[in-house]
């Protein structure tokens, strides 16, 4: 018989940087999960992607065991990395802070496609371009 699920926890943690400090510790502690065990497993799985923010969905079972699934980094983080920026514009309609090329958008869309709700690569590219516009990043053709 399958284990009974008691909850899901969604977090965004730096790759290889999970530790018991907030926000990870309190979120896992509320569900009774072994915090250090999660941190060790997460850090081992994500150490190759150092420096990126990794979304993770943790499934917690009644016996306090857990499984987790890592997702691709958020589009905003990937766009900032490609554009070489620290953060997006506070006023994207007025202040443009950087540029990315169509090729860079396509590369990000290919990486994000499994996590996006798009039928094809073109739809995924449109979503990435919308994120870029909302951050004050200009797309060069």
Curated annotation (Swiss-Prot):
Keywords: Methylation, Ribonucleoprotein, Ribosomal protein, RNA-binding, rRNA-binding
Keyword Glycoprotein on entry: no
Cellular component annotations (GO), alphabetically ordered: cytosolic large ribosomal subunit
InterPro entries: Ribosomal_uL11, Ribosomal_uL11_bac-typ, Ribosomal_uL11_C, Ribosomal_uL11_C_sf, Ribosomal_uL11_N, Ribosomal_uL11_N_sf
Molecular function via GO: large ribosomal subunit rRNA binding; structural constituent of ribosome
GO BP terms in the entry: translation
Post-translational events: One or more lysine residues are methylated.
Residues spanning the signal sequence: none
HAMAP family in the record: Ribosomal_uL11
Subunit structure: Part of the ribosomal stalk of the 50S ribosomal subunit. Interacts with L10 and the large rRNA to form the base of the stalk. L10 forms an elongated spine to which L12 dimers bind in a sequential fashion forming a multimeric L10(L12)X complex.
Family, similarity comment: Belongs to the universal ribosomal protein uL11 family.
Chain's role: Forms part of the ribosomal stalk which helps the ribosome interact with GTP-bound translation factors.
Protein name: Large ribosomal subunit protein uL11
Source species: Chlorobium phaeovibrioides (strain DSM 265 / 1930)
């Amino acid at each position: 018989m399958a284990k009974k699920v008691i909850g899901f926890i969604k977090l965004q943690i730096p790759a290889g940087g999970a530790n018991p400090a907030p926000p990870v510790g309190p979120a896992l502690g509320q569900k009774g999960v072994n915090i250090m065990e999660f941190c060790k497993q997460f850090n081992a799985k994500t150490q190759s992607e150092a420096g990126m923010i990794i979304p993770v969905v943790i499934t917690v079972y009644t016996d306090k065991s857990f499984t987790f699934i890592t997702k691709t980094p958020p589009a905003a983080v990937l766009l900032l990395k490609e554009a070489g920026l620290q953060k997006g514009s506070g006023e994207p309609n007025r202040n443009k802070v950087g540029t990315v090329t169509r090729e860079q958008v396509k590369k990000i869309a290919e990486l994000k496609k499994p996590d996006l709700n798009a039928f094809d690569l073109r739809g995924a590219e449109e979503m990435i371009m919308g994120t870029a516009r909302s951050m004050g990043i200009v797309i060069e053709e």
